[in-house]
Amino acid sequence: MPLISIDSRKHLFYEEYGQGIPIIFIHPPGMGRKVFYYQRLLSKHFRVIFPDLSGHGDSDHIDQPASISYYANEIAQFMDALHIDKAVLFGYSAGGLIAQHIGFTRPDKVSHLILSGAYPAVHNVIGQKLHKLGMYLLEKNPGLLMKILAGSHTKDRQLRSILTDHMKKADQAHWHQYYLDSLGYNCIEQLPRLEMPMLFMYGGLRDWTFTNAGYYRRSCRHAEFFRLEYQGHQLPTKQWKTCNELVTGFVLTHHS
């Protein structure tokens, strides 16, 4: 799989499959591109692209602190390097913050915005505790954190091993910074600027992000929402068939 140069000092590793409308997948802290294991099947319909953000997986580490704005600029540069003028962005969990940031800072880059487990700010207690617990375990017992994350995403032993092995490659300082900046990030005031077609996917009561849907319903009235009752936060892996069907239908319906 290829490495691509973003600037003279940094290379990003990515996987790419299929042809047609490009969809770029943006992962949450630590997990890297492997969390989108099942979204590779979307290559039947689209050109699907899975980068490891810098400091994650097989991409280069960086000398400066990671942040939502930094990674948003990195994805825009990544698109330029691949000669992609505009793409569908799929952001999962905190990866959705990066996708949203690109959406209102570089709307010319985004044809559609698809967000699974999205939030514009971490305002509820559960979300705050999860972010702080992630940072604490990363400092005290990173192996346990990786085990928890892998286990919460799948019951499949092989995929759990794939996810864990990939998380071990992440630079823990940048993983921590990604958590920290996600915890402090707030783009609620910018949401009305997101005018591209948008799809939001949430789980049920076990998905801590679902309460954030109200922010988007008020500010992005053109957006579409889909809730999977009785499901948790980890839709790309645990409900991948429905997730992929929603992506396919949404993009093809709104493609001009």
Curated annotation (Swiss-Prot):
Sorted UniProt keywords: Hydrolase
Similarity comment text for this entry: Belongs to the AB hydrolase superfamily.
Residue runs in coiled coils: none
InterPro entries reported in the protein's UniProt record: AB_hydrolase_1, AB_hydrolase_fold, AB_hydrolase_sf
Enzyme class label: hydrolase
Residue ranges occupied by any AB hydrolase-1 domain in the UniProt entry: 22-122
Signal peptide residues on this chain, from the entry's feature table: none
Protein name listed in UniProt: AB hydrolase superfamily protein YvaM
Induction annotation: Repressed by RghR.
Listed SUPFAM superfamilies: alpha/beta-Hydrolases
